[in-house]
A protein has these predicted regions:
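Patatin-like phospholipase
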Residues: 1-52, 63-273
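Gly/Ala-rich beta-loop-alpha elbow adjacent to hydrolase catalytic centers
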Residues: 53, 57
Length: 273
């Protein structure tokens, strides 16, 4: 009787790492800290599969999604002329139009639309009429960043289609849920919000940002619970209105990113499948 051939053993299927989403939160000038976190991830060989940003985080997310490495992001940030992204308007629905910011983003992303960028990108803004969040994954990246960053009373609301939008930080200070919605299996959240600290606020812009911090605190606590890793750069002394402390913010992001690396690697190993 002929022997029945035994099929060769099937080699084990290699494990696949989880799909990683990077959620970059709002915090105005403190947003430069996101760059330091990105640099640490790159140096560790950890590459997010998608990035989503709110407010200041949307600007960094857009440039990162366009293929800018961390070192280049830092160079761009340190060279940024604040006046180049500020176009004052007559008092009305906002002191700043925001078109200069949109133009700057278009230039920095090579004029590509959101869906044409190398890395999947999501940008969160707030629908002014409904108060609901809107996740932009298609269209004009400059316009989406402008909408996401449109602090009410400072920036004019941004019309996209038939709707008007303002700062995404009002409804999603750190957009963890939207990273999940985009397909992330592991979410790294970077929280740069300035917690209300009881100190007296100075100018009107600082007072407005402090108000947002108070409003966003409970939303943040709820949303961050769904993140796998939360990175919180220590930004004491760096106010949301302080655009002169860019290098200090980037360095703070690096320190916080390095501190989170061990936990991140362990979480990635747990989610291999």
């Amino acid at each position: 009787m002929a022997a029945v051939p035994v099929p060769p053993p099937v080699p084990p299927k290699p494990l696949r790492p989880p799909r990683i989403g990077l959620a970059l939160g709002g915090g105005a000038a403190r947003g430069f800290a996101h760059i330091g976190v990105i640099q640490v991830l790159e140096e560790a060989g950890i590459k997010p599969d998608l990035v989503v940003g709110t407010s200041a985080g949307s600007l960094v997310a857009a440039l990162y999604a366009a293929g800018r490495p961390g070192a280049e992001l830092a160079r761009v940030a340190l060279a940024m002329d604040e006046s180049a992204i500020t176009d004052w308007s007559f008092p009305g629905r906002g002191l700043i139009r925001g078109e200069a910011l949109a133009r700057y983003v278009r230039e920095q992303t090579g004029g590509k639309t959101i869906e044409q960028l190398p890395l999947p990108l999501g940008i969160v803004a707030t629908d002014l009429d409904s108060g609901l969040p809107m996740l932009f994954q298609r269209g004009d990246v400059g316009l989406a960043v402008r909408a996401s960053s449109a602090v009410p009373a400072v920036f004019q609301p941004v019309k996209i289609g038939s709707r008007e939008y303002v700062d995404g930080g009002l409804v999603s200070p750190v957009p963890v849920r939207f990273a999940r919605q985009m397909g992330a299996e592991l979410v790294i959240a970077v929280d740069i919000s300035a917690p209300p600290d009881g100190n007296a606020t100075g100018d009107a812009f600082s007072m407005l940002l402090q108000t947002f911090a108070i409003m966003g605190k409970s939303i943040n606590q709820f949303e961050l619970k769904d993140a796998d890793i939360v990175v919180r750069p220590l930004l004491a002394g760096v106010s949301s209105a302080d655009f002169t402390a860019r290098k200090r913010a980037i360095d703070a992001g690096r320190v916080a990113g390095l501190a989170a690396l061990a936990g991140l690697r362990a979480r990635i190993a747990t989610l291999m499948h």
